[in-house]
Amino acid sequence: MENSEKTEVVLLACGSFNPITNMHLRLFELAKDYMNGTGRYTVVKGIISPVGDAYKKKGLIPAYHRVIMAELATKNSKWVEVDTWESLQKEWKETLKVLRHHQEKLEASDCDHQQNSPTLERPGRKRKWTETQDSSQKKSLEPKTKAVPKVKLLCGADLLESFAVPNLWKSEDITQIVANYGLICVTRAGNDAQKFIYESDVLWKHRSNIHVVNEWIANDISSTKIRRALRRGQSIRYLVPDLVQEYIEKHNLYSSESEDRNAGVILAPLQRNTAEAKT
């Protein structure tokens, strides 16, 4: 299959990135290799979208620091970048809205590009054309329009399984995410994503739009474990990018005090969805 026939894909990873780890970066590489390897897709970009402070997750440090760490982690990447839109929102934004924002942004950019494209004219002397000839000639001179890349949600199996947590997700949001965008789920050791998809009617219905990527090289790094090591004064070298480690140490970001941030506060999606369910 030629590149022109492949669907271009943008991988979007939403999350706390508290802090970003080497595992987060590996998710992008694993997903890119898998999608390109199908012969049906070409991954053209990866986007890291840190959640805003309004998410109210326990131990979540300010978005300002999390964004900077993500930018430091992707400093040398040629295709993965950090987007701040979600992190700058005053209210927590559902993942569906973040996906929609980035898809609309791509479509708007493509529209602007087409409008600004120069009009091609037939060189040489003007002559009279029949309507059929004129239409055919114009068609051959017009540049081929390129399809807008499709945004797909990149995640780990833990996010996939969180769909089953009561009031954490709206059922209609889950349906739209898997039906209109799609998931690329990288599985960790001990997760059975395929079984979870089988046990969910919604996920099973749209299983063709859910790509499960097996991580054959075991990597159990997590932000939670990184924060725990930091609280205990243990080394995190080789678990996060060097620049991220330096930034954490310079600003003394993670401690017992920071882990108590938002303690006792209900997570934003649980608070909102529970309230809406009662109305």
UniProtKB/Swiss-Prot annotation:
A motif (Nuclear localization signal) lies at residues 123-129. The keyword Secreted does not apply. It comes from the Eukaryota. InterPro entries: Cyt_trans-like, Euk_NMN_adenylyltrnsfrase, NadD/NMNAT, NMNAT_euk, Rossmann-like_a/b/a_fold. The lineage of its organism: Eukaryota, Metazoa, Chordata, Craniata, Vertebrata. One of its GO terms (cellular component) is nuclear body. It comes from Homo sapiens. It is found in: Nucleus. Coiled coil: none annotated. Residues 107-144 are annotated as: Disordered. NAD(+) binds at residues 15-17, 23, 57, 92, 95, 156, 158, 168-169, 215, 219. Pathway: Cofactor biosynthesis; NAD(+) biosynthesis; NAD(+) from nicotinamide D-ribonucleotide: step 1/1; Cofactor biosynthesis; NAD(+) biosynthesis; deamido-NAD(+) from nicotinate D-ribonucleotide: step 1/1. Activity is strongly inhibited by galotannin. Inhibited by P1-(adenosine-5')-P4-(nicotinic-acid-riboside-5')-tetraphosphate (Nap4AD). Belongs to the eukaryotic NMN adenylyltransferase family. Divalent metal cations. Zn(2+) confers higher activity as compared to Mg(2+). ATP binds at residues 15-17, 24, 58, 156-158, 224-227. The modification Phosphothreonine is found at residue 119. Homohexamer. Interacts with ADPRT/PARP1. This is Nicotinamide/nicotinic acid mononucleotide adenylyltransferase 1. Its cofactor is Zn(2+); Mg(2+). Catalyzes the formation of NAD(+) from nicotinamide mononucleotide (NMN) and ATP. Can also use the deamidated form; nicotinic acid mononucleotide (NaMN) as substrate with the same efficiency. Can use triazofurin monophosphate (TrMP) as substrate. Also catalyzes the reverse reaction, i.e. the pyrophosphorolytic cleavage of NAD(+). For the pyrophosphorolytic activity, prefers NAD(+) and NaAD as substrates and degrades NADH, nicotinic acid adenine dinucleotide phosphate (NHD) and nicotinamide guanine dinucleotide (NGD) less effectively. Changing residue 257 to K: In LCA9; results in significantly reduced enzymatic activity; the mutant localizes to the cytoplasm.
